[in-house]
Amino acid sequence: MATTAQHANVQRARQGYEAFSKGDMAAIGELLADDVVWHVGGSSPISGDYKGKDAVFGFFGKLMEQTGGTFKLEVHDILANDEHTVTMVRETAARNGKKWDSKAVHVTHPDSAGRIKEFWAFQENSTAADEFFS
């Protein structure tokens, strides 16, 4: 079977998830547009629209604080073209004696330089996510 080259946005996404797993905010910062908008659906205390890199990094900090640093992402697959990147992930975490283990889909739109301009997270069970993070 012939091997095909990965789309550049697949490579960037893999770099981003690897940087997140290592807590490498400098590397993540290079992958984000300055005016990035990060959408986290639901009605929990971490839900909302985070605008700009500082707000996104603040969200990451809040996520780690809420889970005592246990929040992890496992990438299952990444699909991409010039306009979208879709990543299927498994999320795990622990919080207040509860365990979180869920599938999610992350959708990003890159800017002309390939940096993430907009991000959406879609949970397998948004009600359960709201309960876990509340």
Task: Label each region the model flagged.
Residues 1-134:
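C-terminal and inter-domain tail/linker signature
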